[in-house]
Amino acid sequence: AKMNLSSYILILTFSLFSQGILLSASKSIRNSDDDMVFNTFRLGKAFQKEDTAEKSVIAPSLEEYKNDESS
């Protein structure tokens, strides 16, 4: 009976231990996922800024082109 109890405790502690490892692993994975999402978001914002900068450069030349055509 004593043997069964000690092995039961061993299994219990082992399962708790492995659950703890899984939990911390999933937490760190989730954190890195958040970082990835955040970085992608920042990249997207940077691209948008470049996009608007390009548009403000292109737009005036387009306006000139339209004016040339109408005259």
From Swiss-Prot:
Its main location: secreted. GO terms for molecular function: melanin-concentrating hormone activity; type 1 melanin-concentrating hormone receptor binding. It is found in: Secreted. Residues 1-20 form the signal peptide. InterPro entries: Prepro-melanin_conc_hormone. GO terms for cellular component: extracellular region; synapse. The keyword Amino-acid biosynthesis does not apply. One of its GO terms (biological process) is chemical synaptic transmission. Keywords: Secreted, Signal. The keyword Signal applies. Belongs to the melanin-concentrating hormone family. This is Pro-MCH. The lineage of its organism: Eukaryota, Metazoa, Chordata, Craniata, Vertebrata. The gene is PMCH.
